[in-house]
UniProtKB/Swiss-Prot annotation:
It comes from Bartonella bacilliformis (strain ATCC 35685 / KC583 / Herrer 020/F12,63). The lineage of its organism: Bacteria, Pseudomonadati, Pseudomonadota, Alphaproteobacteria, Hyphomicrobiales. It is found in: Cytoplasm. Its EC number is 2.3.1.234. One of its GO terms (cellular component) is cytoplasm. Substrate binds at L137, V138, S139, G140, G141, D170, G183, N288. Keywords: Acyltransferase, Cytoplasm, Iron, Metal-binding, Transferase, tRNA processing. This is tRNA N6-adenosine threonylcarbamoyltransferase. The keyword Iron applies. It catalyses: L-threonylcarbamoyladenylate + adenosine(37) in tRNA = N(6)-L-threonylcarbamoyladenosine(37) in tRNA + AMP + H(+). One of its GO terms (molecular function) is N(6)-L-threonylcarbamoyladenine synthase activity. Required for the formation of a threonylcarbamoyl group on adenosine at position 37 (t(6)A37) in tRNAs that read codons beginning with adenine. Is involved in the transfer of the threonylcarbamoyl moiety of threonylcarbamoyl-AMP (TC-AMP) to the N6 group of A37, together with TsaE and TsaB. TsaD likely plays a direct catalytic role in this reaction.
Amino acid sequence: MRLLGIETSCDETATAVIEHNLKGKSHILSNIVWSQIEDHAPYGGVVPEIAARAHVEILDTLILEALAKAKTTLKEIDAIAVTGGPGLIGGLLVGLMSAKALAFATGKPFIAVNHLEGHALTAVLTHQVTFPYLLLLVSGGHTQMILVHGVGNYQRLGTTFDDALGEAFDKTAKLLGLPYPGGPALEKAALLGDKNRIPLPRPLKGNKQLNFSFSGLKTAVRQAATAMAPLSEQDVSDIAASFQAAVIDTLQDRVHLALQYFTSQYPSSHNQEHRPPAFVVAGGVAANQAIRLTLQNLAHQHSFEFIAPPPSLCTDNAAMIAFAGAERIARGQTSPLDIAPRSRWPLDENALPLIGTGRRGAKV
């Protein structure tokens, strides 16, 4: 089965073609990502209207490019998968309308995919991970600890009360005057800094629940930067290093508890006759090398296989959407052409909203 994938949930326009066989293995034939960094850089963050217009301008071209690079034609495509949410409504509409039009014109099966499911299943695409496994999803819009039982079967163990980790990285970088996108810039600055210079809090460290909070850490950084102003280049590096160290300590604490919980639920998963259970880190923040190394060491201490997709598949891409769509279609699932985009679409539909996250709950 050959699928065309389309991803337009935020500030990357992406298309891909994959080949998916009956055994559930996929081969990426093309994976095109068009970044809007230059469009949003003057504003220091993503502007939804600009993002949607940029998707409109380039999506058709990228669909043709993905088909050409895969050396295939639309006629040879068996199904079309597109991100249906969560994300920015304007961008989601662009991708959905294009996918629906192609499906209607060609009569191909069509499925709207949860963007988070794309991230959640990327490790199955890249490493043939077996279920169940533990997933830490860390991106610009989401920070969640998820127990992945199977395709369509997700148990949210924890989520953020406030800012997603990627958002905290970007806002801290902006506060320090670092260029957009903030996450990579802050990671680079931290390499030259003293992580012990600025005392910063470790939010929820020691808490027995598996939730996250980063707004207090962000506020502490602002207070420290204000007290030290004007900031020298070394000051910026030291604050960046101290912030990143606080994040890593917090993640270590949360992940340690999650790994213990997984082992208590699946004690036989550590049977030496089988592949060790997997701890997967996915989402854009998973590209941070300091975070990767720390979590890899922690996973190995708990006898877990550590898996982080290659950086190109950590950030938003259409290959993961095509793969998630293929897994759904293989189970007989498709979407109606009148399906609407969802700005919020939790992986775990049964998870209750966190107290203190407002009427609509946490951003899941």
